[in-house]
Amino acid sequence: MRPYALIDLHCDTLTDCMYAGSNIIDTLDDPARTLSLTSIPKDIHWAQFFAVFVPDELRGEKAIRFFDDACANFDRQMRKFADRVSPCRNVADMERAWAAGKTAAFLSVENGSAFAGDLSRIGKTKRQGVCAVTLTWNGENELGSGNVTDRGLTDFGRAAVREMERCGILIDVSHLNDAGLADVFETAERPFLATHSNARAVCAHRRNLTDVQIKEMVRRGCLIGLNYYGPFLRDGGAVRSLDDIYRHVAHFFDLGARKNLALGSDFDGAVLPPCLDSPEKAADFYEYLLSRGVSQQDADGIFFENARTFLRKNLG
């Protein structure tokens, strides 16, 4: 049995091509990438969040220029491959793309340094088509600190959370440290998401979410995307099979996150285990979940329905 659809909350394909120096106009159909229009299964309605990853070392005007260049690249690719992919800003756009047999493409940002410490840039970012922003990467920026430090949100970071909610940009807390996430809990008034994070009780990495954090996100109606990266799935990183990601699924379910769990692959942002290293293996993953006793309703929830419901309610 194959899934009807799949919504993937995170990949780094856009930025990966910029670093590699390849022809950025052709990136979305570059077979050298983990994710390409060719590798996406034609019989699965696919929605992909394409993240503009802004490196931690870029701040201020340099971060703005990098972000603007990446957005221009995204727009070029949407035009070049308009027969196969469609840019989307909401669920209605996504469903129109699916009805036309196209991949639905959402634009996101990984690292709030793209705001360059200026609240007025948040509204502009929304107008550029960005649907979600990861507040930090691993290091520090104007909003706060990532998982390599213990500092929480700055005053600007708290103000940015409120302005993102006002503008209708989804807040992404993946990469944020525990103090920063606690500050988001105090500041945010709307549900938010962790686009690519797993359960720390299963794999003890700082990038993963604690049980207390997961339960609070469930209470708030948030969304959590399973990350396929080995060191976030299994202590030591040596993923042996799909059993390693299933342990996270089972743990999230035990914590009441059955309606809050989604997918956030991290394609082209990390070296992934062989069982999860291609969009073409999505059907194998889906069938595996069913073989482990996950109901079709819950498997559909993980693959697309939980994310679709969340986006319909929260993506302005």
Question: What do the predicted segments below correspond to?
Answer:
Residues 2-227, 231-236, 246, 250-251, ...:
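Extended, charged catalytic domains and RNA/DNA-binding interfaces, predominantly
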Residues 16, 270-274, 311:
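Short active-site-adjacent structural elements
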Residues 193, 262, 300-304:
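Beta-strand segments within the central parallel beta-sheet cores of soluble alpha/beta enzyme folds
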Residues 228, 256-279:
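Short acidic/histidine-rich active-site segments
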Residues 277-316:
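Mid-to-C-terminal alpha-helical segments outside catalytic/metal-binding sites
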